[in-house]
Swiss-Prot record:
The family this protein is said to belong to: Belongs to the TrpA family.
Active-site residue list: E49 (proton acceptor), D60 (proton acceptor)
Top EC category: lyase
CDD domains for the chain: Tryptophan_synthase_alpha (cd04724)
Protein name listed in UniProt: Tryptophan synthase alpha chain
Length: 269
């Protein structure tokens, strides 16, 4: 069983959901990013979703765009991102790690080489944000060749064909987007049909569903679980804490620890 499969089986046995924070690798720099990721893992994060910094991200709102820029300005490269991933995996051999990135970063290395490097660094799953289902075949093939689980986004306006396609291609977990638009902790509105989408995904035997976009408070984690999901992903709210404490690293780690504990506590059904 993969790390994600093992995690969801363990959580189900305990009647718990998953809390998965997202941060950008090397934000605000390599060493502080490692401390930040360790703080998340040590304070209850069930899995980690980590972003490769990119200068022109499609789905990212201003908070995560700023994180990308900080990492790039600190000299972060794909090379350094893989080094940081390997360091995290070495310290945390059990925690599931998913990568979120844009296709251009993969093209720079070729599909096969990129997924090989993911496997070597201990990555479990990869979500390529800008690859539609219609163009996913080569990515899925390369991922599976190297034991990486391909993850796809189910948008709130998904028709039946899209729901079926996401369910059939996604492994590890299914990323259910709360609403249309870009990531944001401020925009916490959710599409009205999410409960129906969850039912439709489950009818197609989709991988466990994690809801993302606009998840910033413990009660929203509880709401996600009430819909029938297996947990929630929080990106902008997590990254905002980093942004707020750029000049005070100890305070940043302290606030991230408290935030993670509170969000995780909300997953106890």
């Amino acid at each position: 069983m993969s790390r994600f499969d093992t995690l969801f089986a363990q959580l189900q046995a305990k009647n718990e959901g998953a809390f998965v924070p997202f941060v950008t690798l090397c934000d605000p720099d390599f060493d502080r990013s490692f401390d930040i990721i360790c703080t998340l893992a040590d304070n209850g994060a069930d899995a980690l979703e980590l972003g490769f910094p990119f200068s022109d991200p499609l789905l990212d709102g201003p908070v995560i765009q700023a994180a990308n820029n900080r990492a790039l300005n600190a000299g972060c490269s794909t090379e350094k991102s893989f080094r940081l991933l390997a360091k995290v995996r070495s310290k945390y051999p059990e925690i599931p790690i998913s990568l979120l990135l844009c296709a251009n970063l993969i093209y720079a290395q070729t599909l096969d080489k990129f997924y090989q490097r993911c496997a070597e660094a201990g990555v479990d799953a990869v979500l390529v944000a800008d690859i539609p289902l219609l163009a996913c075949k080569d990515y899925v093939t390369a991922a599976k060749k190297h034991g990486i689980q391909p993850v796809f986004i189910c948008p709130p306006n998904a028709d039946e064909k899209t729901v079926a396609g996401v369910a059939s291609h996604t492994e590890g977990y299914t990323y259910l987007v709360s609403r249309a638009g870009v990531t944001s902790a401020e925009n916490q509105s959710h599409a009205a049909n999410l409960d129906t989408l969850v039912e439709r995904l489950k009818a197609h035997n989709a991988a466990p569903i994690l809801q993302g976009f606009g998840i910033a408070r413990p009660e929203q984690v509880k709401q996600a679980l009430t819909l029938g999901t297996s947990g929630a992903i929080s990106g902008s709210a997590t990254v905002k804490i980093i942004e707020k404490n750029l000049d005070n690293h100890p305070a940043c780690l302290q606030e991230l620890a408290r935030f993670t504990r509170e969000m995780k506590a909300a997953t106890h059904v």
